[in-house]
């Protein structure tokens, strides 16, 4: 079975089988840079007519079984540390297969790479770092990203889903684009030092303030995807969150969709007076 390698948030993932790999376009690893070390492997088998765990014979042990409730007929079995997974699909749907890929990758990374996955948009200011906008669906994450593009020349890395990793020295946080972008068209394969996290709220007047530790837990952490299927991985993600929080300011922006909101946030994150 032909396998393709991709690199997402610093993690290699090798996927074999299925045409769905086109959805990961832009995250391919060139042949000359591929490696077989520290690789998450997923094989995709389409056309299952019945799911019977006893009949599944992958070339790896089976300790975990996943199903996608929103996409019936999409299943996955994984070994103990999620290094090897086999996706079993009755009739492939793009969102279902991508959810399986995400479950395999996030499970593999959460226990190793001090990684969290956030419902957020991400912009990068060249030479300065990134700003991440967090909030419920429809609150204006992509709108804020576009305003930063318009008024500050920022580049939009992703409009909906972002990986964060704690740097090896524990002194910084890196934000990574991902192939998962929701309904937005933005999904660059780019990483940037994270300078600020902005929790969004719509309001008739613009204001911004730094959140307390308690507010961070209630207003920001609720937008982080926790791997609730595995208690150990959930503990790893919570530990990563705890390591990241002292390193990056978490702000609450109550705002209109205008330039003043951009300038106000710029000053709060980068410590400069907006010009």
Name each region found by the language model.
Residues 144:
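Hydrophobic positions on the alpha1 helix immediately C-terminal to the Walker A/P-loop
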Residues 1-137, 147-157, 162-275:
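A noncatalytic interaction/capping subdomain that flanks phosphate/NTP-handling catalytic cores
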Residues 141:
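Conserved lysine of the Walker
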């Amino acid at each position: 079975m032909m396998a393709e390698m991709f690199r997402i948030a610093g993690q290699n993932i090798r996927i074999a089988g299925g045409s769905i790999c086109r959805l990961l376009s832009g995250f391919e690893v060139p042949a000359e840079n591929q490696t077989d070390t520290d690789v998450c492997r997923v094989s995709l088998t389409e056309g299952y007519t019945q799911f019977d765990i006893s009949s599944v014979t992958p070339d790896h042990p089976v300790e975990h079984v996943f199903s996608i409730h929103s996409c019936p007929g999409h299943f996955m079995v994984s070994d103990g540390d999620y290094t090897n997974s086999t996706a079993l699909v009755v009739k492939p749907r793009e969102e279902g297969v991508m959810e399986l890929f995400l479950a395999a990758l996030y499970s593999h990374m959460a226990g190793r790479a001090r990684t969290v996955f956030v419902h957020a948009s991400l912009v990068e200011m060249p030479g300065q770092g990134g700003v991440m906008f967090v909030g419920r669906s429809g609150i204006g994450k992509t709108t804020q990203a576009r305003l930063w593009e318009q008024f500050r020349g920022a580049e939009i890395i992703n409009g909906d889903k972002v990986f964060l990793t704690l740097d090896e020295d524990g002194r910084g946080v890196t934000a990574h684009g991902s192939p998962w972008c929701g309904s937005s068209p933005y999904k660059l394969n780019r990483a940037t030092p994270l300078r600020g996290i902005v929790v969004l709220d719509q309001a008739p007047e613009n204001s911004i303030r730094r959140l307390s530790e308690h507010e961070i837990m209630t207003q920001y952490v609720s937008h982080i995807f926790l791997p609730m299927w595995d208690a150990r991985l959930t503990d790893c993600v919570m530990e990563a969150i705890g390591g990241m929080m002292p390193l990056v300011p978490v702000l609450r922006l109550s705002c209109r969709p205008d330039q003043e909101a951009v300038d106000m946030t710029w000053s709060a994150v980068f410590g400069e007076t907006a010009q």
